[in-house]
Amino acid sequence: MRGPGRALFFFLAVAAFFAATIGGWRWHEGARVVRLGGDRAAYLHFDIVEVRLETKDSDLDDEFRRTPPRAVVTRDGETLTTIAGIRELTLTRAAPGVWSARWPVPWNAPVGSYFPALLGREDLKERLRVAPFLIGRRAPIPLPKGGFVVATLESVAPLSTMRVKAPDGTEKDWRGLLDWAKDLGADAFLILGGQSPGLQDGQVWVETNRGILPEVAKECHARGLKFGTYAMFSLTMSKTVKIPGYEYGLEIKDSKPVVTRAVSIREPKRLDDVAAFLKPFADDPNVDFVGVDYIRNALGGYELTDDFAAEMPGVKVPPEWPKLSRDERMTWLARKKIMRKDSDFIDAWQWWRARRVALVVKELKRRLGDAKPLWAFTLTWDKGWHHGQDVVMMNDAGVDYDALMFYEADKPQYDAMLKDWHAYVRRGDAQLIPGNIFDWELHQKDPAGPAEFGRRMRRAVDDVYGDGPARAVFFHDLARLLWGRLGPWGTKGWADEARSISRYVKSRAASAPEKKP
């Protein structure tokens, strides 16, 4: 071989040598790198972060098998304690070179970057590559500007035969309800459309008004009202009739499970049926929003025991757990919850149920689409947590209008609830619509009657958020306003107060700058 050929051969040999050398160096460096981060880049508030450590160093992997790696999650340099008192994570081997632990996102965690940190391994400092993860929020469909007032009707009484005494004293058909909505200063009418079980054997829904609701929607639009309809998700209105194919929630009495009238929140067929019921309304151009009530484990919930123990980080079960029967495991959870001595355990139970509800909402929203706002009713004791609801998770999952049911509490309880809400949530966290009920009995027959109703509503508007007034309210419900327990003030007295509240919330909305979640 001579001349150019020999030179080319020499060049290729040198190139191959350097390629092999550099490639070997890169492989060696890659094998040395230890990566620590989340299993994805971003999370929402109902998520459980999988903190992962990955290495191609087999010697280090073997070392971790003898002494598992430990980690924490930090924000702004501060180590965080999350749900169930979880602070330090001990990672377990998920695959060769892969170690992981689960970290539930804290209640209403601030938006921003979070950094996992490896503990006790200063020797790996130069090799460690840490990837932060983001906790964010979903942006909901905005509320109408200038304040928003909703009048509800929680009734499946036949609209076709309904007679209503209108505000002017004349007797009308169901259209009289819309007269009242307008008279109260409402911008929207929301009606219960889906209640279970049906009137016939095996029927899922009471079908009495289903066919007439599109006509009601058109009439609302003709009057300048928005229209919405909702379905009850978990609770059914019969103590004896069970819908075929459903799993129902379980309560524990005398150490034995008792079937309730609430469908289990994990029942997939219920999600199918609710989505199928609401979808035609979500697609109807005359329907402005759709919603759900009882979107929680309304009764019982102990059928979820095994799921909770398996899925929720930080839950410590007794050593004999695998040997216990299902009834015994449910009884253990019931006693643990009722005793309320373990605050971390209660925190875990509440968070995990709220997560399960949020996952149901997320799937419901996916099936209904993003074109229309999704409304949900939320109970207000302990910010909803007591009932397995969290408005921040709900917002992230797909609820656009979260209606807070400030019902039934006496004055000290009402003050305590509002104090909790004020400390917990800000206007950018979720779109809250506080509401109150036309019912003197549920105001403890306060001598002020409707004036107490109004006082509570104004307080909720002013104080539910920690940084400004609410921009919407709802009145529950027109059936109670017309035919309910109203004391000596009657319909007119309560309606006058509601009208005043409508003006109040709109004036507050106009004077306060809008803050987007």
Question: Predicted regions: what is each one?
Answer:
Residues 11-191, 203-204, 208-211, 506-517:
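Mature N-terminal, pre-catalytic/accessory segment of carbohydrate-active enzymes
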Residues 143, 149-171, 211-217, 226-285, ...:
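Active-site-adjacent "subsite" loops/lids of carbohydrate-active enzymes
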Residues 153-168, 197-210, 257-272, 345-357, ...:
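The substrate-binding groove and active-site-proximal loops of carbohydrate-active enzymes
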Residues 169-197, 284-288, 394-402, 464-472:
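Catalytic domains of carbohydrate-active enzymes, especially glycoside hydrolases
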Residues 172-177, 211-213, 362, 379-395, ...:
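Alpha-helical scaffolding within the catalytic cores
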Residues 176-178, 182, 190-238, 348-368:
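Aromatic-lined substrate-binding rim segments of carbohydrate-active enzymes
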Residues 180, 256-401, 405-408:
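Polysaccharide-binding and catalytic clefts of secreted carbohydrate-active enzymes
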Residues 399-416, 420-516:
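Substrate-binding cleft of secreted/luminal carbohydrate-active enzymes
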